[in-house]
Design a protein with these regions (language model features):
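Solvent-exposed loop segments that connect transmembrane elements
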Residues: 229-251, 286-315, 356-398, 438-475, ...
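Transmembrane beta-barrel wall of Gram-negative outer-membrane proteins
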Residues: 175, 187-288, 402-408, 413-429, ...
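Outer membrane beta-barrel strand-and-loop segments of large Gram-negative receptors
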Residues: 370-409, 466, 599-603, 609, ...
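C-terminal beta-signal and adjacent terminal beta-strands/loops
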Residues: 673, 743-755, 778-830
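N-terminal periplasmic accessory domains that precede
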Residues: 76-77, 97-99, 119, 144, ...
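Membrane-embedded beta-barrel scaffold of Gram-negative outer-membrane proteins
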Residues: 195, 328-335, 339-357, 557-568, ...
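Gram-negative outer-membrane beta-barrel transporters
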Residues: 495-499, 626-634, 652-752, 822-829
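Short acidic/polar hinge/loop motifs at secondary-structure boundaries
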Residues: 108-109, 116, 121-148, 196
Length: 830
C-alpha cells in the first residue's frame, strides 16, 4: 500500500527530477531557473541496451528510483494506476494476475501460463494468478513494456512485460540512508515501516595484484507492519445452525513484510563488471481483504447482517504466507567489438494459504441434496452422497505451493556507432512447481460424504481405516523447460530512418503429474492410489512445442521527435489440463464415456500487434508528450471454464477463436516554471470477442458466447495526474513542497460471461469506476527529509475485484483514508 514508504533522497530535486537546481529566493533567480529547467533524461533497458526513454521506439512507462521513493510506492497496487496499460486481478499481495493491454480472459487464473511476464532484474518470476509482489525498497526503476515482447522476453510476454530493476553496488562512493514511516487508517489500525541501505566501496584503489580492480557491497533491509481495515463480523453460518463467534475480529487483513538484499560488485578496469546479488522476502497476511455481500446465501438481511463496506463473514481461519529468495550472477563486458552479457539466476518460492470455504461447500451440499433425491436405495449409487456434509458444513481450503526456477541467458550486442547494429542471444530455463491442495470439512467423519466414500472403498476392496476431515486432496506437479535463440538487427536506411527486425526461435517441454481424490491417507498427505479413493492417479504425460515469433519496427527521428510503427507477435505456451478422468478436461481414458477426456489438451495462443506511436519534446525540453495507438488480434485464446457436466465441478483451459483489442496510451510531463511540475498518463482499452463461440458445443451443457462479449478485468479508461509545487523559499534549511496525486480507474467486468463458474452461476458484475486523491507535503535538506500525507483524501470505496472463486461472491476493496508521516536520514555520499 502507498502509505508506508520513503520520501525523496537528500539533495534530489523534487520537481520531477529537474536537472537544474530550482531553489531560489528572488524573482531574478526564479526566471533564471525557469530558463535552465529541463526534464530529466531517463535511461531504460527495454531493448536490452541502455537507451534514453525518448529514443526508444516502443511503448515504455518508466518510474525512476526518485519517483518510487517520493511517492511511497511499495507494491503492484501502488503503481498500477500510473501505467496506462497495466491492470491487476488481485486477491491479496502475492496472489494476483498482472495484465497489460487488456489480455485477460478470466477474473481468476489457475492456469500455468500468464499473458504478461514479470521480471526481477534479469529473471522472469511470472506465475499466473500467483505473481510474487517484490517490495520496492532501493529499486532503481520500474519499466512497463506495452505490447508483445516475445522476441526478447519470450513466453508469457504475450501482451507486455513488467520489469523491476534493483540498484546495484556503487564502487565510487560510500552512501546510505535510514527511513521510518508511520500511519493510521481511519477505519483500521496503525502501521510502521523501517528500512535502510548501506553502500560501501571495498577496493576503491584496487589491489597490489590487480590495481584496476574495484569492489563494493550494498546491503538493504526492511520491516513493515501494515494494518488491516476489514472486520470479520458476527454472522450465522449459511445453514443457520451456528455462528462465527469464535472468529469475530477487527482489521483481519493486517500483514507483515520483512526481507533484504545483499549485493557485491567487482569492476575490473572500465570493461568488465561482475554482480552477485541475493534477495529475500517474507510476507504474511492474517486474513484476506475482500468483503462479503448481501446476496446468494447472505441475501436475507432479517437473518444475516447488513454488511458494511469493510465487513466480511468468515467461519474458519484465513491466512496467507509467501516466502521467496533469488540468487543472481551477472557478468558484463564492454569490449571494442561490442557488449557481452552472461547472466544466471535461481529463484525459490514457497507459498501457503488457508481460506474459508464454508459458503462454497454449502453450495455443494445443496447440489448433493438434489442428487440424493434420485437415490435408488443402493448407497453406492447415491451420487449426491459425496456432497452430504451433514447439512451445514464448516470448511476451509489449504494450498501449499513450491516453485523453483533456474535461468541462464547469454547475449552479444554490437556497437551502435555504425549504420547497422544487432543483438543476439540464447536463453534456457528450468522451472519446477509442486502443489498440494486440500479441502477440509469439520466433523466429516460420520457424514453422508464419509459413509459414501467408505462404502465405495469397501466395494473396491479398500475400506477406510480412521477418521478424517480431509474431503478432497489434489497434487499438481509440473516440470517446464524452455530454450530459445533470439536476435534483432537495426539498419539506418538514412540518418533519420531506421528499420529493425528480429524474432525468437523457442522450444518448450512441459511434463505434468496430477493425483487427486478423497480421504487421502485418512489424515492428510498425498494420494496413495493403492489405499486411497483416487480420481486421477499417475502421470498425465507431457506437451512439447516449438515455434517462432517475429518483430518489425520502423522509426523516424527529428531533432525533438520520434515516430515509429511496429508489427510484433507474442505467444503463450499450450499444455494439458490437470483434471480427474470423468471431466472433459481429464486425461484420455477408456474408463469413462465421452465427453470425458475430450478437451484435455489446449493449444498455444498468439497476439498479433499493429502499433504506431510518437515521442516528442517541446518548449526547450520542458514539455514531453508521448502517445501510442495499438490494434491487437488475440488468436486461439486460452480461456478458463468450468466443466458443464453435472456433479463434476472442475476447471480447465479451452481455446476460443479470437478477440480484438484496441487502445491508446498517452504520457505528458510538463515544467511550467521552476516551481511547478505536472505529470499525466491516460489509457483507453476496448477488448471484446470478435468471433462467436459455443462452449462445449457437443455436450448437453453447451454455452453460446456471442460476438462482442467484453474481456474482463481491464478498465475501459485510466487516468493519473501528479502535480507538485516547490515553494520558492527555504524552510528549516530545506526545500518545502506540496504534491497532489489523482487516479481514476474506469469500469470493467469481473468475468468472461461467467464461464469459469457455471454450476453456481454467480453474476457477471460491472465493476464501477472509482477515483482517489492523495496529498503530501514535505521538506528536504541535504541531511534529512520529512513529509506528512493523507492518502485517499475523499475516502473512496473502490471496487477492485468481484471474486467468484468461492461461489459466494466477494468484493476486494481499496484501502480507506489514511494519515501518515515519513522521516529519512541520509548517511552521506552522493
Amino acid at each position: 500500500m502507498a502509505h508506508d514508504r520513503k520520501n525523496s533522497t537528500a539533495g534530489r530535486n523534487l520537481s520531477l527530477a529537474i536537472s537544474a537546481a530550482v531553489a531560489g529566493t528572488g524573482s531574478a533567480q526564479a526566471e533564471s531557473d525557469a530558463e535552465d529547467a529541463r526534464l530529466e533524461e531517463v535511461i531504460v533497458t527495454a531493448t536490452k541496451r541502455d537507451l534514453k526513454l525518448q529514443d526508444t521506439p516502443l511503448s515504455v512507462t518508466a518510474i525512476t528510483d526518485e519517483e518510487i521513493t517520493l511517492q511511497r510506492l511499495d507494491n503492484f497496487e501502488d503503481y498500477v494506476g500510473q501505467i496506462p496499460g497495466l491492470a491487476l486481478s488481485q486477491r491479496e499481495p502475492g496472489a494476483n494476475s498482472v495484465i497489460m493491454r487488456g489480455c485477460a480472459a478470466q477474473g481468476l487464473s489457475f492456469s500455468d501460463s500468464a499473458t504478461t511476464s514479470v521480471y526481477l532484474d534479469e529473471q522472469p518470476i511470472t506465475s499466473a494468478g500467483y505473481n510474487p509482489d517484490p517490495r520496492l525498497v532501493d529499486v532503481a526503476r520500474i519499466e512497463a513494456l506495452g505490447g508483445p515482447q516475445g522476441s526478447l522476453f519470450g513466453d508469457a510476454a504475450q501482451c507486455g512485460t513488467l520489469r523491476i530493476i534493483t540498484n546495484k553496488p556503487d564502487t565510487s562512493v560510500s552512501d546510505g540512508w535510514l527511513d521510518v514511516s508511520g500511519w493510521s487508517i481511519g477505519e483500521g489500525g496503525a502501521g510502521t515501516d523501517l528500512s535502510g541501505m548501506v553502500n560501501v566501496p571495498l577496493l576503491e584503489d584496487g589491489s597490489s595484484i590487480y590495481p584496476d580492480l574495484k569492489a563494493a557491497v550494498r546491503l538493504v533491509g526492511f520491516y513493515a507492519n501494515e494494518p488491516g481495515w476489514v472486520d470479520n463480523v458476527l454472522t450465522p453460518t449459511p445453514g443457520q445452525t451456528s455462528t462465527n463467534s469464535n472468529r469475530v475480529d477487527d482489521d483481519v487483513n493486517s500483514s507483515v513484510w520483512y526481507g533484504g538484499r545483499a549485493g557485491l560488485r567487482l569492476e575490473a578496469g572500465e570493461n568488465w563488471t561482475v554482480d552477485l546479488t541475493g534477495i529475500y522476502q517474507y510476507y504474511e497476511m492474517d486474513g484476506f481483504g475482500d468483503v462479503s455481500l448481501n446476496q446468494q446465501h447472505f441475501a436475507d438481511t432479517s437473518v444475516f447482517p447488513s454488511f458494511g463496506p469493510h465487513d466480511q463473514a468468515r467461519y474458519t481461519e484465513d491466512y496467507w504466507e509467501d516466502e521467496w529468495y533469488q540468487i543472481a550472477l551477472t557478468l558484463e563486458g564492454n569490449l571494442s567489438f561490442g557488449d557481452v552479457v552472461l547472466t544466471t539466476a535461481y529463484y525459490d518460492r514457497e507459498s501457503t494459504y488457508l481460506a474459508d470455504s464454508t459458503s462454497y461447500l454449502q453450495n455443494f451440499q445443496q447440489v448433493g441434496d438434489y442428487f440424493r433425491s434420485f437415490n435408488t436405495g443402493n448407497p453406492y449409487y447415491d451420487t449426491g452422497g459425496i456432497y452430504d456434509f451433514g447439512g451445514y458444513p464448516i470448511a476451509n481450503d489449504f494450498d501449499g505451493r513450491q516453485t523453483n526456477n533456474w535461468v541462464i541467458e547469454a547475449r552479444y550486442a554490437t556497437p551502435t556507432d555504425g549504420r547497422w547494429s544487432a543483438i543476439v542471444g540464447a536463453f534456457y530455463s528450468k522451472r519446477q512447481v509442486d502443489e498440494v491442495f486440500m479441502s477440509n470439512v469439520e466433523g466429516l467423519t460420520g457424514t453422508g460424504a464419509f459413509n459414501y466414500i467408505n462404502y465405495a472403498g469397501y466395494y473396491v476392496g479398500i475400506p477406510m481405516k480412521s477418521a478424517s476431515n480431509n474431503w478432497w486432496t489434489g497434487v499438481y506437479d509440473s516440470d517446464l523447460k524452455q530454450s530459445a535463440f533470439f536476435g534483432e538487427v537495426s539498419v539506418d536506411v538514412t540518418e533519420n530512418f531506421t528499420i529493425k527486425a528480429g524474432g525468437r526461435f523457442y522450444s518448450i517441454e512441459n511434463d505434468y503429474i496430477v493425483m487427486n481424490g478423497t480421504l487421502i491417507g485418512m489424515n492428510g498427505g498425498i494420494p496413495n492410489c493403492a489405499i486411497d479413493y483416487c480420481y486421477a492417479p499417475g502421470d498425465l504425460g507431457s506437451s512439447d512445442e516449438n515455434g517462432f515469433v517475429p518483430m518489425v519496427n520502423f522509426s523516424y527521428r527529428w531533432e525533438n521527435a520520434l515516430v515509429y510503427a511496429t508489427y510484433s507477435e507474442g505467444f503463450r505456451r499450450g499444455g494439458a489440463n490437470s483434471a480427474r478422468p470423468q471431466s472433459v478436461f481429464g486425461p484420455p481414458s477408456d474408463l469413462f464415456d465421452d465427453p470425458a477426456g475430450t478437451m484435455n489438451s489446449y493449444e498455444s495462443d498468439t497476439v498479433i500487434n499493429h502499433e504506431i506511436g510518437a515521442k516528442t519534446e517541446w518548449l526547450d525540453d520542458r514539455l514531453r508528450f508521448n502517445i501510442s495507438y495499438y490494434q491487437m488480434t488475440w488468436e486461439n485464446i486460452q480461456v478458463q471454464a468450468e466443466d458443464p457436466q453435472d456433479n463434476i465441478f472442475t476447471l480447465g483451459i479451452v481455446n476460443f477463436p479470437e478477440a480484438d483489442i484496441d487502445g491508446v496510451e498517452m504520457w505528458v510531463s510538463w515544467l511550467p516554471n521552476a516551481n511547478w511540475s505536472i505529470e499525466a498518463t491516460v489509457g483507453r482499452n476496448d477488448g471484446e470477442l470478435s468471433q462467436a463461440q459455443t462452449l462445449f458445443a457437443d455436450t448437453p451443457g453447451a454455452i453460446p458466447v456471442p460476438v462482442g462479449t467484453e474481456l474482463p478485468i481491464v478498465p475501459d479508461v485510466k487516468r493519473h495526474l501528479k502535480v507538485m509545487y516547490q515553494l520558492p523559499r527555504t524552510l528549516l534549511g530545506g526545500e518545502p513542497y506540496i504534491m497532489l496525486r489523482y487516479t481514476y480507474t474506469g469500469e470493467s467486468v469481473n468475468s468472461l460471461a461467467g464461464i469459469e463458474s457455471i454450476s453456481f452461476s454467480p453474476p457477471v458484475v460491472q465493476q464501477g469506476s472509482w477515483r482517489t486523491l492523495d496529498i503530501q507535503a514535505g521538506i528536504e535538506t541535504d541531511a534529512w527529509s520529512a513529509s506528512l500525507y493523507v492518502d485517499n483524501v475523499t475516502d473512496e470505496n473502490g471496487e477492485l475485484f468481484f471474486n467468484n472463486r468461492f461461489a459466494q461472491q466477494r468484493l476486494t476493496v481499496n484501502q480507506p483514508r489514511s494519515f501518515g508521516f515519513n522521516f529519512r536520514y541520509n548517511l552521506g555520499g552522493k
